[in-house]
Amino acid sequence: MKISPLGAVIAADILDVDLAKPLDDQTIALIGDAWNDQLVLRFRNQRLNDDDLLRFSRYFGELDPPGPNPYGVTFLPEYPEINVISNVRDDAGVPIGNLGDGEAVWHADMTYIDN
């Protein structure tokens, strides 16, 4: 695995790691350190299914469920921790996701939590 900073201030590319596979403790620690140092990490060319995404996310702590949405549905009932953000509608005109009308402007979630 290679960590390549993208600038002098924040952000790095994480290269040569397959997030679809389980990671060892050393790799998880290196990614965590890079996240603390760089604040924004970019992982290119990843092919993750929902299980892969949840496994990788859980390496860094307990997941908070998405908040309520205006449609009152869980978009992925088998994966309630995943919030689908999409502006796509199905054939009946029902949104397949949340926040599809530009509601997700830049913001920071959970800033009121210590850790």
Question: Residues of each region from the PLM?
Answer:
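Fe(II)/2-oxoglutarate oxygenase catalytic core
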Residues: 2-40, 44-115
